[in-house]
């Protein structure tokens, strides 16, 4: 309904009603909202991603979704990213934008990709590249800590191609 009508206030109110941020189980309910909205946005068009982000960022800023729900809600989108990309080739780009917006809100740090993401995501071969795309979407140069995250996500194949996370970053920024 929100994608057609565009009433952000109503959408944020719906999120609050679904999550019930002051009640027991809010983190789990918030995670389900984040998961569903993220997968829907990943499979959508760029305009849908922007609409989802306007609701999500406002919901997080206003305390309608606990920040702990974000990482929990991204477990399946991260784990199944390679499968989602088969049907929705822009899914990785959309997910990078979504994660970058949460970094801008200071709702999380990039190191969650190393510490709190599904193992399959970290070992499937594209985790370092997603981290770079997140940093590119966020803008600015990556910090040493963020490059360390990329380095920790690099596979052996990545390391054969790039001697360091910095070189991998530079190669992708030039594209």
Which residues fall in each region the model found?
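Alpha-helical interaction scaffolds
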Residues: 1-175
């Amino acid at each position: 309904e929100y994608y057609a009508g565009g009433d952000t206030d109503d959408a944020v109110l719906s999120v609050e009603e679904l999550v019930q941020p002051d009640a027991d189980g809010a983190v789990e309910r918030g995670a389900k909202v984040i998961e569903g909205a993220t997968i829907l946005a990943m499979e959508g068009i760029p305009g849908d991603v922007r609409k989802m982000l306007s609701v999500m960022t406002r919901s997080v800023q206003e305390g309608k979704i606990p920040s702990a729900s974000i990482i929990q809600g991204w477990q399946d989108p991260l784990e199944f990213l390679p499968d989602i990309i088969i049907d929705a080739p822009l899914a990785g780009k959309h997910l990078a934008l979504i994660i970058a917006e949460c970094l801008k809100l200071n709702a999380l740090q990039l190191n969650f990709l190393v510490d709190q993401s599904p193992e399959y995501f970290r070992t499937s071969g594209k985790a370092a590249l997603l981290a770079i795309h997140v940093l590119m979407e966020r803008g600015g140069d990556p910090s040493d800590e963020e490059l360390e995250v990329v380095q920790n996500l690099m596979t052996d194949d990545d390391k054969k191609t790039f001697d360091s996370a910095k070189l991998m970053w530079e190669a992708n920024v030039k594209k």
